[in-house]
Amino acid sequence: MGINELAIFKYDDLTDSPSELTKRIDGILAGMEMGDNVIFQSPVWISPEFEKRFIDKVKLYQGKVIIFINDVPPMMFASNEVLMPDFIEVYNKADLLIVSSENMKEYLVDKGATVKKIIIQNLWDIPVEFEKTSETKYLSKLSFAGSDKKFGISEKLKSSDIKVEIYDNRPDNKVIPNNIHYSGYVDEISLLSRLHEGGFGLIWSEDEYIKNYMHYCNSYKVSTYLRAGIPIVAHKSISCANLIEKNNWGILVDTLEEAVEVINNMSEEEYQKYIDSVSKVSFLLGNNWFTKKLLVDAIYKL
């Protein structure tokens, strides 16, 4: 696509004087030419001030700036909420914003974002090939790829009659119910292969703060499960709920108890309909379709 990388590494910018910061940014932008457009992925996990200075410097080259918002730190951590005005100031320097969802767009506009051109990302791509040793089949099983301690999965499902596969390390000094199994950390390719065997992929949190952020952000887990070829189970408030429902990618529920009931009463024919729908988006995710379309749309909308 004719896009070159401008590499930014994470460091403590408080150690830089204003002149040192200018020199650092000049070095990062050494390959730029007048009129070049820049896609800036935010946050860079340095500081809002660094992002402001960086974008201001880019604009001196008389090109346009697309800010691709990967995450919004003031929404992720309660301790960072005070930084929201700083990040809104960063975003308002853009000629175009790429945001995770319609919900995120509405939220940022409500918080003061004034950029007129905004594009919705919707899904992360998973351009990874993996081995498919068998056909995906109906299993009364929920798979969860993530921190059990952070998301509270086993505690909520410990009395359930559904099998739960958690891709996290088994906790020490804890009695594990018979329906809960910990598989530890596995690499992405192995994870996709194992998920492909069947059942459902779970995107969930019992932590209300995290659940609220899921209403706005793009969960990488959604794409992981869809790329693996299995339907997903998520809360009705998830940011991509409309996509899931419209495309028959999985089950949207209010509670995990409701999810277990739906799964246990599902026929193999019903499950196969989900598999047929998911297989289409799995192919697109594996070929970077969403990212390519997103970037082309953004460039042409500038």
Please annotate each region the language model reported.
Residues M1-D12, K158-S159:
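N-terminal subdomain of nucleotide-sugar transferases
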Residues D16-E106:
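Extended catalytic core of nucleotide-activated donor transferases of GT-like folds
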Residues D95-V109, A113-F130:
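Donor nucleotide-sugar binding/catalytic pocket of nucleotide-sugar-dependent glycosyltransferases
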Residues N103-K105, K149, S239-C240, E258:
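Alpha-helix capping/helix-boundary segments
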Residues I126-R194:
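Conserved catalytic-core segment of nucleotide-activated headgroup transferases in glycan assembly
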Residues I189-A228, A234-N242:
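Nucleotide-sugar-dependent
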Residues N247-V253:
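A short acidic/histidine/glycine-rich donor-binding loop in glycosyltransferase catalytic cores
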Residues D254-E261, E268-L302:
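A charged, aromatic-enriched C-terminal amphipathic alpha-helix characteristic of glycosyltransferases
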